[in-house]
UniProtKB/Swiss-Prot annotation:
It comes from Homo sapiens. This is Phosphatidylinositol-3,5-bisphosphate 3-phosphatase MTMR3. The lineage of its organism: Eukaryota, Metazoa, Chordata, Craniata, Vertebrata. Belongs to the protein-tyrosine phosphatase family. Non-receptor class myotubularin subfamily. Zn(2+) 2 binds at residues 1141, 1144, 1171, 1174. Residues 1029-1062 form a coiled coil. A 1,2-diacyl-sn-glycero-3-phospho-(1D-myo-inositol-3-phosphate) binds at residues 326, 351-352, 414-419, 459.
Amino acid sequence: MDEETRHSLECIQANQIFPRKQLIREDENLQVPFLELHGESTEFVGRAEDAIIALSNYRLHIKFKESLVNVPLQLIESVECRDIFQLHLTCKDCKVIRCQFSTFEQCQEWLKRLNNAIRPPAKIEDLFSFAYHAWCMEVYASEKEQHGDLCRPGEHVTSRFKNEVERMGFDMNNAWRISNINEKYKLCGSYPQELIVPAWITDKELESVSSFRSWKRIPAVIYRHQSNGAVIARCGQPEVSWWGWRNADDEHLVQSVAKACASDSRSSGSKLSTRNTSRDFPNGGDLSDVEFDSSLSNASGAESLAIQPQKLLILDARSYAAAVANRAKGGGCECPEYYPNCEVVFMGMANIHSIRRSFQSLRLLCTQMPDPGNWLSALESTKWLHHLSVLLKSALLVVHAVDQDQRPVLVHCSDGWDRTPQIVALAKLLLDPYYRTIEGFQVLVEMEWLDFGHKFADRCGHGENSDDLNERCPVFLQWLDCVHQLQRQFPCSFEFNEAFLVKLVQHTYSCLFGTFLCNNAKERGEKHTQERTCSVWSLLRAGNKAFKNLLYSSQSEAVLYPVCHVRNLMLWSAVYLPCPSPTTPVDDSCAPYPAPGTSPDDPPLSRLPKTRSYDNLTTACDNTVPLASRRCSDPSLNEKWQEHRRSLELSSLAGPGEDPLSADSLGKPTRVPGGAELSVAAGVAEGQMENILQEATKEESGVEEPAHRAGIEIQEGKEDPLLEKESRRKTPEASAIGLHQDPELGDAALRSHLDMSWPLFSQGISEQQSGLSVLLSSLQVPPRGEDSLEVPVEQFRIEEIAEGREEAVLPIPVDAKVGYGTSQSCSLLPSQVPFETRGPNVDSSTDMLVEDKVKSVSGPQGHHRSCLVNSGKDRLPQTMEPSPSETSLVERPQVGSVVHRTSLGSTLSLTRSPCALPLAECKEGLVCNGAPETENRASEQPPGLSTLQMYPTPNGHCANGEAGRSKDSLSRQLSAMSCSSAHLHSRNLHHKWLHSHSGRPSATSSPDQPSRSHLDDDGMSVYTDTIQQRLRQIESGHQQEVETLKKQVQELKSRLESQYLTSSLHFNGDFGDEVTSIPDSESNLDQNCLSRCSTEIFSEASWEQVDKQDTEMTRWLPDHLAAHCYACDSAFWLASRKHHCRNCGNVFCSSCCNQKVPVPSQQLFEPSRVCKSCYSSLHPTSSSIDLELDKPIAATSN
């Protein structure tokens, strides 16, 4: 049997072991209200009194009208019935959930179901992490490398012991050695297989010591201070008992730790420098009574002083009374008389039973009324913050001894797996900046908590038959709370943010990953959890921007000294007092900041609120909360507004000094790299905006200012002032778009064209019960300088009304008058055009075109004029009056428009032709995409199509050849046909999303499925940090500025190359036929511009713009030329393979080139390996964190 066949059989067997269960619906109309993970199967779906409740083999999901609860089953500690009809769920992370039912029988039925679901597993394979991994294996059967990247931790975790020994600089020649006495866990089942001990301690002595220490947990070194050589060691309590036993080998080992530390300090100190002073010695602080003159400054004197070991600090986490009481159970503490040169300190930390009671009191307090009058006193009575204070003080004592006193420290409690890892892990975090990075923190957790046997299965309650409640205690959660306190005090010292810690708390209990299963490494090895489950570090990886602290500075304090008083500590509200997740993103429809997803390197993760027309608003409001940003897209809402839709809506012009990141809402203009402004209505669907603007022209006024600057006056038609005010309030998104159309173009020509093109237009509209509202908003021409004036011209909508005969209504525009001293007519395009839909089922991949030839507008001197010109900032705008030809434009289609339907089959959009403004300087093109609207408001959508995102297009200018001689001239109008190629960008995004989101299979949208914007890829609720979100917006704005500068440099380079080619052509005397194209290309700054080829008005009508990169294949860098990774500069060797990026061709290591995405430019339409930089530009979606602020930032306090 070949390997492939055997692998496929293994996948089949794995899925047979974890089969999907039959779904039981209490109501046939109910659907699963969430998207299931791989291996997840929903068992029950029913209705509570005011919610929909669903239970799967992984989670409990309760969808209320205005919020939702999404909890993994293993996070629930207990379920009980209260008040007959109410279920009371207590969670292990301090949350309490209440669910009300209509009948007592229904309440009891769900009580029984939940108690069966949360019962500790009979065997470990019953935990969801095994089913999740098995089903993932089937999905990735054809992509083994990608599967490994997704489910495995990094090399820094798998090779942690060797890397840490080298990084901390242990002297393995003279002072220390690595003992393999615990190989295959034959000495101690809860210890790692490799231990660091003094070099002269033999394995036989270690065996003797193990008989004297609790659970055979002998003293082992875990950390070395890289500057002074002081170390931290850990162990279990000595088994002194009432008989006062002692062990000579144990006493020798403890003293040897101090001697080896002194020896290691001497050897490392001699390597550093020859300039020795008292502070260079490990006992420099004790030299104050020595007259340090030249006679003692020689090498022999320094060496003799360094040999003397420092006094070792034995830190016992217990109180003295508790340590003495443990002698009755065979334990005890070190006797100072038996351990010379040692100091014993008792910290008085509470045991797990006291911590559990304190946590239960805290949980009870957090479930009370939101604002109890005695909150602070009640919080103090729980003693939770007091326990955190004692823990921080204990760790700080270790830090002070190692860093300042340069003394070695030995830490233990009773057994050495609860309070001991808390102290040593916290001390290492304070001492070493490496552990404050994401990778270092992962290594810290793996070594101090997992390798040294913290009993996660017993403490978290997900072990096999772990019914003993006395063994449960949130020890690891308490430690994470201390880390959170450090984050608050040192916001710039941690690479990871609070969301990282919140995720770690959730997955400590969720059992989605196998990292925290079992009680020790021996059990995990026997159960093969590493091979059969995914690692939590694959989610909390260093490359995930959602968990990076943007305030982090690697140059921050090397050693942290926090304030440990209770008054300086704060309750961790994100974990203990979380806000309920909104049901849908429409709850937070007012975003106070512009969308940060404007940079390709910063993919968006949230959704914009949607705007729709409803047949029955009452029904719509029953399903979700009302939209705050809803506009009058339904005729039944505002008849007065419908009667005056012809009025021109103008948005306020942004001042030249406006902060690009200070827009108060998405409806306000947002600066983009080219200087253009984009104001996006909060309710426009993503696919609609994308198709509207994807082929939009790269517009800029190409007219240099004449000696006397001309102004543009804009005036709305005669209209009721109250109505005008109302229309401005209801549609503040009205935008500026420069359009050209000859007013003399007859109705006959347009109607003739309409007869041919309108059936195609109407055929693209599918019949739906709810209407669409498509809004093109606020695309303003980027100004050349301060003196430019942006002229808002028109917005247009398409509304599909579900009443009898379907109609699409286009509002009648107001003709604009543009004057250079005298007014020139520049009529704005279409009006109201009713049409019938051809059928309910229209293929979604069809792209419809509506084209027409548009004549240019001639100015007084015979040159072509534009509606958008540069104007003096001191001039007032002139008048833009309605034209008499306005009424003749009724029932005309949008000239030069392109109709698209997205791949989701429900979006109709009207798209401006890329060259609607002829031969104006084409500067920065924009593509916006918002959330694609489907038939159902609450349908599932790809997260990659979720947030407004702008994709800059190649930069350049399109100027007429005559512009060099006549500064104020504009060039000809191109036909819409020249730019009518259909872009399928939204379809490509959807295709990429299907390939990239591997954590969940596809699901059919249903009326009960909410939007997934508040659920992360791990099925948990998304945690949002407003401060980090704002920082990402600032970072995004900075990246945009950098990209703009890069493009300007490229533009100048192209201009220089163009001038060089032109000058060389004249110099060589080549005046062949090509000379006719020189005037058209002299001023052209874009090599790809359509107007470079001819001066004929419509000669490019049959040409299509082709990017130069589209015709070239990426040239790969040869393997033999790449010795280091192009991104991280790490050297390649046997275990670090070389990987080519299929997009840029450079060579990377596996961690820097671990993403897969289609690369259409290289004819690679299946997911192919690319580097992280190319992945960010090719893939508009990424997991996990919402880059757009959904709520205004508000200060909170506990």
